């Protein structure tokens, strides 16, 4: 599928799997997508914004109050521009913030303002993922219309074995493609059928 004319917003949070999102950004660009990346401050400890800027050709946003850009209300303009948002790897911290409407950084303000489909791919230690609080937060996001991409199982960065791995890049891209190609809801649209 060609993603020409589509904007994919990647929200990268502070998990060890953050580096994998560089391959996702690169693959989406090859499919013709306009890729924007927002990183949390914690994500910058795992991969630098420069990597995403080089791959996408856009400034990678981290700081909500960054003044090194043309004047616009950046979090709103990015929210309006996006055809789909993918937050991956989604940490327990960012999942909790999104589930409760906490918008205290660039990523969470954009997600809160975005009206496009939103995908969340949790990636964390099994104990954190299976914690009832995290599970409640994921259900809350689903209730609000987010699509939660199931984590994969395997050996985690902490050497535990279990669920919590970020899915492979092609799985994440397939979710994006499916979401963009999904037929739009026609609720509230008047259609005249004539014979």
Each model region followed by its residue ranges:
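A cross-family phosphate/adenosyl-ligand binding-site feature
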Residues: 1-119, 125-195
């Amino acid at each position: 599928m060609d993603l020409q004319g589509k904007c994919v917003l990647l929200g990268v949070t502070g998990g060890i799997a953050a580096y994998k999102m560089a391959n996702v950004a690169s693959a989406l660009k090859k499919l013709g997508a306009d890729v924007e990346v927002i990183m949390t401050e914690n994500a910058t400890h795992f991969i630098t914004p420069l990597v995403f800027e080089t791959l996408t050709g856009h400034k990678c946003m981290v700081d909500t109050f960054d003044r090194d850009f043309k004047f616009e209300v950046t979090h709103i303009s990015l929210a309006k521009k996006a055809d789909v948002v993918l937050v991956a790897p989604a940490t327990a911290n960012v999942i909790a913030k999104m589930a409760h409407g906490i918008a205290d950084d660039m990523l969470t303000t954009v997600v809160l303002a975005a009206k496009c489909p939103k995908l969340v791919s949790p990636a964390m230690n099994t104990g954190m993922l299976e914690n009832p609080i995290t599970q409640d937060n994921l259900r809350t996001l689903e209730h609000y219309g987010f699509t939660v991409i199931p984590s994969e199982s395997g050996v985690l960065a902490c050497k535990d074995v279990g669920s919590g791995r970020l899915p492979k890049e092609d799985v994440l891209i397939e979710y994006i493609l499916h979401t963009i190609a999904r037929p739009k809801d026609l609720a509230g649209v008047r259609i005249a059928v004539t014979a």
